Curated annotation (Swiss-Prot):
ATP binds at S223, G224, G225, V226, D227, S228, S229. Catalyzes the synthesis of GMP from XMP. The active site is at C82 (nucleophile), H169, E171. Its EC number is 6.3.5.2. The keyword Transmembrane does not apply. PROSITE patterns: GATASE_TYPE_1, GMPS_ATP_PPASE. GO terms for molecular function: ATP binding; GMP synthase activity. This is GMP synthase [glutamine-hydrolyzing]. It comes from Campylobacter lari (strain RM2100 / D67 / ATCC BAA-1060). Pfam families: GATase (PF00117), GMP_synt_C (PF00958), NAD_synthase (PF02540). Disulfide bonds: none annotated. Homodimer. Pathway: Purine metabolism; GMP biosynthesis; GMP from XMP (L-Gln route): step 1/1. One of its GO terms (cellular component) is cytosol. The gene is guaA.
């Protein structure tokens, strides 16, 4: 079992993943586990510290979430955040009740006492609050470390036992010194070394791959995106002669994608590629299907069928490698009190019975860590920093039924969007950009004629790891050019809208 420097117990906060991400950014390996994980499993991870995340519940309610009480008897530091703070207060005998004044948004805290948490940090800080309950009295054995206008016990702690509790969220960017607070907890309270990096990860994973695979061969599914490209490069670095790299044209690709992928693997990566034309089978199975979850399941099942059929042609192929990321695992599973957001075709979309064993060497890392790993493995910047493209492809960018006419419309619009972003210098400034074909027609006028055609949505976002994202504030002139070109050059589209939703509450992809 892989060890973790810091374990984050998830009580359902939308920000839980950010806690792990902020620690990893500073070289500390953090892992997320459900709040009700057994004490034995926690001990097996040999953590140097534990963080209790925020969450939507109230500790005094009948449906409150509680971790094993033994967490506080492990003689290791514990940090409670928001709900985790209230849980700690409740555990040690303090009273938690509904707050007369709810706090959502920015607040100012004043540091009252010296603490490892605030070492080398200003006495007054802006933080991000998101709570409707309050701690009414200080737990026995703790002291107040910081206060805010609405919370006299905003931060409290026990320096001797290294137990700390924060009412605010240090993991979000709005808490100006939040990242430093988490670093201080890891460094000074937990004595963690900042040794987690992609160089060490690459060596460790290569060795694990060799040990797991042995003399068998691995079928590596690639899409041309950064995730699968990095998986292929990592496998090649570990067991090059045992890797069979397969690209499936499922008919759901962007314009020119197949040719780009074939060129990249042959000339940029130097890896032989088997290309399979499976357009007909994918599109026939998707015919008439409108539900996004059903689309994902169909695509996942069909991919496996195609790969298993190909595996039969290659002696000793026993494994299927995929570019599943930590974010995929989180969004496709119920972690702690968190809810399943959507299944991913390479996680929740897999059939229960699969004749190939699954190997997912990237499942412990976030997207930006994948990019860093790609650079570590010697991939080109063009490959590493290409915008993400979902495994189900354009199927989840078409609202409703997927068919060839809709795919062609979407491809043409998408080409124009990317051309405009690149020519204006905005492509490299954004995390992801794509068009969504809406299941909506609208009235328009072109020349002297009435039109009743499709509407397309342009989605461009900024992000660092894909767990959260904000819409890109593109210049109006650029948006106007994108809209004008799509409407004028793509017959069948007469309206373009721009998605200004952030994640959360929206996801990056529409389906």
């Amino acid at each position: 079992m892989k060890k973790a420097d810091i374990l984050v117990l998830d009580f359902g906060s939308q920000y839980t993943q950010l806690i792990a991400r902020r620690l990893r950014e500073q070289g500390v390996y953090a892992e997320i586990l459900p709040f009700n994980v057994s004490l034995d499993e926690i001990k097996a991870k040999e953590p140097k510290g534990i963080i209790l995340s925020g969450g939507p519940a109230s500790v005094y309610a009948n449906d409150a979430y509680f971790c094993d009480k033994g967490v506080f008897d492990l003689n290791i530091p514990v940090l409670g955040i928001c709900y985790g703070m209230q849980l700690m207060a409740h555990h040690f005998g303090a009273n938690v009740a509904p707050a007369g004044h709810k706090e959502y948004g920015k607040a100012t805290i004043d540091i009252q006492n010296d603490s490892d948490l605030f070492k080398n940090l200003p006495k007054k800080q802006t933080v991000w609050m998101s709570h409707s309950d309050k701690v009414e009295n200080l737990p026995q054995g703790f002291e107040v470390l910081a206060t805010s206008e609405n919370s006299p016990f905003c931060v409290f702690g026990d320096e001797k036992r290294k137990f700390f509790a924060l009412q605010f969220h240090p993991e979000v960017q709005h808490s100006e010194f939040g990242k430093s607070i988490l670093k201080n907890f890891a460094k000074y309270a937990c004595n963690c070394d900042s040794v987690w990096n992609m160089g060490s990860f690459a060596k460790t994973q290569a060795q694990k791959i060799k040990e797991e695979v042995g003399n068998d061969k691995v079928l590596c599914a690639v899409s041309g995106g950064v995730d699968s490209s990095v998986v292929a490069a990592l496998l090649a670095s570990a067991i090059k002669d045992q890797v069979v790299v397969v690209f499936v044209d499922n008919g759901l690709l962007r314009s020119g994608e197949k040719e780009q992928v074939e060129y990249m693997f042959k000339h940029t990566l130097g890896i032989d590629l088997i290309s399979i034309d499976a357009r007909e089978i994918f599109l026939s199975r998707l015919a008439g299907v409108r539900d996004p979850e059903q689309k994902r399941k169909i695509i996942g099942n069909t991919f496996i069928e195609v790969f298993e059929e190909e595996a039969k042609k290659h002696k000793d192929v026993k494994y299927l490698a995929q570019g599943t990321l930590y974010t995929d695992i989180i969004e496709s599973s119920v972690v702690g009190a968190s809810k399943t957001i959507k299944s991913h075709h390479n996680v929740g979309g897999l059939p229960e019975k699969m004749n190939l064993k699954l190997i997912e060497p990237l499942k412990e890392i976030f997207k930006d860590e994948v990019r860093a790993l790609g650079m570590e493995l010697g991939l080109s910047k063009d490959v590493v920093y290409r915008h993400p493209f979902p495994g189900p492809g354009l199927a989840i960018r078409i609202m409703g039924e997927v068919n060839e006419p809709s795919l062609e419309l979407l491809r043409k619009a998408d080409v124009i969007l990317i051309e405009e972003l690149k020519s204006s210098g905005w492509y490299d400034k954004t995390w992801q950009a794509f068009c969504v074909l809406l299941n909506v027609q609208s009235v328009g006028v072109m020349g002297d004629n009435r039109t009743y055609d499709n509407a397309v949505c342009v989605r461009v976002v900024n992000a660092s790891d894909g767990m959260t994202a904000t819409f890109s504030h593109l210049p109006y002139e650029l948006l106007e050019n994108i809209s004008r070109r799509i409407i004028n050059e793509v017959n069948g589209i007469n309206r373009v809208v721009y998605d200004i939703s952030s994640k959360p509450p929206a996801t990056i992809e529409w389906e």
